[in-house]
Amino acid sequence: MAAAATMAAAARELVLRAGTSDMEEEEGPLAGGPGLQEPLQLGELDITSDEFILDEVDVHIQANLEDELVKEALKTGVDLRHYSKQVELELQQIEQKSIRDYIQESENIASLHNQITACDAVLERMEQMLGAFQSDLSSISSEIRTLQEQSGAMNIRLRNRQAVRGKLGELVDGLVVPSALVTAILEAPVTEPRFLEQLQELDAKAAAVREQEARGTAACADVRGVLDRLRVKAVTKIREFILQKIYSFRKPMTNYQIPQTALLKYRFFYQFLLGNERATAKEIRDEYVETLSKIYLSYYRSYLGRLMKVQYEEVAEKDDLMGVEDTAKKGFFSKPSLRSRNTIFTLGTRGSVISPTELEAPILVPHTAQRGEQRYPFEALFRSQHYALLDNSCREYLFICEFFVVSGPAAHDLFHAVMGRTLSMTLKHLDSYLADCYDAIAVFLCIHIVLRFRNIAAKRDVPALDRYWEQVLALLWPRFELILEMNVQSVRSTDPQRLGGLDTRPHYITRRYAEFSSALVSINQTIPNERTMQLLGQLQVEVENFVLRVAAEFSSRKEQLVFLINNYDMMLGVLMERAADDSKEVESFQQLLNARTQEFIEELLSPPFGGLVAFVKEAEALIERGQAERLRGEEARVTQLIRGFGSSWKSSVESLSQDVMRSFTNFRNGTSIIQGALTQLIQLYHRFHRVLSQPQLRALPARAELINIHHLMVELKKHKPNF
């Protein structure tokens, strides 16, 4: 098969070569015709050349054998020579047809050739034009860059010139003195707005000239003389104006707040002096300090003197202590006269002085109070005095800071230069008064007034009085503690045997303590202080010991208990009116009262029902120990107890109720004690019933005589007092 394929390929190659030779002969006449191209030079096509690579030929043959036409020809057994002739003929026909088509389209082809040539010429000219345009663009771009560089340089020069112009303009404006400024400074009154405006302009120009002189600017010499003369004139006019305002403070009955308000409108005047004439500024400040210092001192000295004239005529003395014997005979409901005792131990309405409404109320006017014959306790005078001091000090401090342009330590120093003498005088007056003051409530109220005024000053952002408040408290606290300790000592050293006749009603010393303690506790609750509570605790211990010492003077335990209950109840009632229910004082006296009340009820039930109480306790003890059989020997005793209770319980309860109501001054407390005694009696009789229900006593004939427990309760309710 391979040999046949090789032979077929060789035959086909020979046919092609022969056809090519024939075509060359036929095309010979046309080849020499005009306008035709030379025949193709195909080179050497001899397949027998040694240079032909057989392997490659074999590959081509194999590839041709894969052709469908070749496969079909080999399959049908077509004669290859005939087939090649047929193919050659077809190729010649196609070639002739192509030549004829080419000849027919030769004009069009020539026209197309001319058009292409013309287009080439046009494109060449366009290329030349675009080249020239590109060259022009390159030149323009270079020019634009040059212009940009020139523009940037011009902008820099412009900015520099503008900066120089601005600096020069500022310099010239700062140095030039306009005529309006000269006219206003020389001719206008200081109170006119234009004088203030031009004064600010003059201050700015003077500052600018000083700055330029420091830089060595020669032009400053031209205006220095004019500015100096204007400055001297302005300083003179300002000095006269401010000193005149300060001197107006000295006029009698002058409200110095009005000149201060006027000065604040022209506070720039002092700033101008401070920056341009410090000697004059110091002169004005010193004159202000000297004038206001004397005015405040004179005012407060006079006010204090007149204020103390409306104090209560009778005040507490060193003998007006809690434990000092009250020589005056007093009834049960009586209390020390307000005029004679000045409410030493009672608070009353005095506590209102620290209420928000009273604390910042208008100050007292002494001559008005004198005309109305009104009198006040010391704490009211103290509040009025220090509220005036607080209000004026706050206003003065703020004025100093704003007008004299000071703050911090400098403001404190200037404030104390103005108010120092007044504050010292006030402290000396307070120290002198406290030396003979024995009214602890007044001193304690003054302490709380100071604490509240200190908070008000802090809210107003006026720290200048902080040191003064500390000094006042340093005077008040030791005196308060001393008075409290004196009262403690007076109670401790009181001898009950020297107090006269004994009485089971509340003692006047315990009443004093109750009023005094409730007053201090109620005040202290607003701003708690541990030291105060410690001192009150000491006083409470001494009062409790005093009550026990007095109770020991009674011969019977019943009277002792009545005295203790009356005093504890009174102290508890007074404390609960002002102190909180959970305060230590209230809880302490409540426990003491409950304990003594329970003991008194047992003491009260003992005479009429003592036998019943003793039997019930003994029987319950036997039952608890399992010795109930021993109750069989108590039948006679039980019978006697049943019959005795049935015959006497009503009269005993009636007597008991009357005894209680006679013994206790507080009807509510007496009612509570009666109720407690009857309740305990019912419980006792109920326990007696349970004992009699034991098997050992169940068959006792006297059990039929027992009073029904419900009937007893109904009857006892009739003896409950109603108020």
UniProtKB/Swiss-Prot annotation:
Q: Provide the topology term for how it sits in the membrane.
A: Peripheral membrane protein
Residues bearing PTM N-acetylalanine: 2
Keyword Phosphoprotein recorded: yes
**Database matches in Pfam families:** Vps52_C, Vps52_CC
Compartments (UniProt record): Golgi apparatus, trans-Golgi network membrane; Endosome membrane; Recycling endosome
Mind telling me which GO cellular component terms the entry cites? cytosol; EARP complex; endosome membrane; GARP complex; Golgi apparatus; membrane; perinuclear region of cytoplasm; postsynapse
List the residue ranges forming a coiled coil, or say none. 107-127, 194-215
GO MF assignments? syntaxin binding
Q: Which domain of life is it from?
A: Eukaryota
Tell me the leader sequence span.
none
- Please indicate if the UniProt record lists Lipid metabolism as a keyword: no
Indicate where this protein is primarily found: Golgi
A Gene Ontology biological process term: lysosomal transport
Q: Which residues carry this modification: Phosphoserine?
A: 355
InterPro entries to which the protein is assigned, alphabetical: Vps52, Vps52_C, Vps52_CC
Q: Which UniProt keywords apply?
A: Acetylation, Coiled coil, Endosome, Golgi apparatus, Membrane, Phosphoprotein, Protein transport, Transport
Q: Which family does it belong to?
A: Belongs to the VPS52 family.
Self-association state and partner proteins as the record states: Component of the Golgi-associated retrograde protein (GARP) complex, also called VFT (VPS fifty-three) complex, composed of VPS51, VPS52, VPS53 and VPS54. Component of the endosome-associated retrograde protein (EARP) complex, composed of VPS51, VPS52, VPS53 and VPS50/Syndetin. EIPR1 interacts with both EARP and GARP complexes and mediates the recruitment of the GARP complex to the trans-Golgi network. Interacts with RAB6A and STX10. Interacts with BLTP3B.
Please describe what this protein does: Acts as a component of the GARP complex that is involved in retrograde transport from early and late endosomes to the trans-Golgi network (TGN). The GARP complex is required for the maintenance of the cycling of mannose 6-phosphate receptors between the TGN and endosomes, this cycling is necessary for proper lysosomal sorting of acid hydrolases such as CTSD. Acts as a component of the EARP complex that is involved in endocytic recycling. The EARP complex associates with Rab4-positive endosomes and promotes recycling of internalized transferrin receptor (TFRC) to the plasma membrane.
Name of the protein in its database record: Vacuolar protein sorting-associated protein 52 homolog
What is the organism lineage in this UniProt record?
Eukaryota, Metazoa, Chordata, Craniata, Vertebrata
